[in-house]
Amino acid sequence: KLSEKYNITIVSCGTTPNLKLKKIWIEDNLPFCRFIGVNFKDKSDKSSVDMNNSIFIDDVARFLDLNNAKYNICFGDIYKWNEEWTGKRCYNWCEVENYIKEIERKGDN
């Protein structure tokens, strides 16, 4: 549903073999998404990807803190790696969609 209105890019960190498998899976299952792989060998986080004027969704708090996105959403349940996140949290994709609609209504996009 979101892909009908927005450009969706999946940014994932990992090692080369892991990123190759993720890319194949995304191409097969989410062909409407663009994939950017960030190799842990070269970078330690996703901050090298320009997310200006974007909504960044991740389940890892440190990745949410280290980017230039206009909006950051911590996705999913509370875990050790995101328990300190105090910003916006969405527990499912319906909540994400509703939050995006809220942003649009406010004209803050």
Protein language model regions, located:
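Conserved Lys-Pro-Asp/Glu-containing loop-to-beta segment of HAD-superfamily phosphomonoesterases
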Residues: 37-67
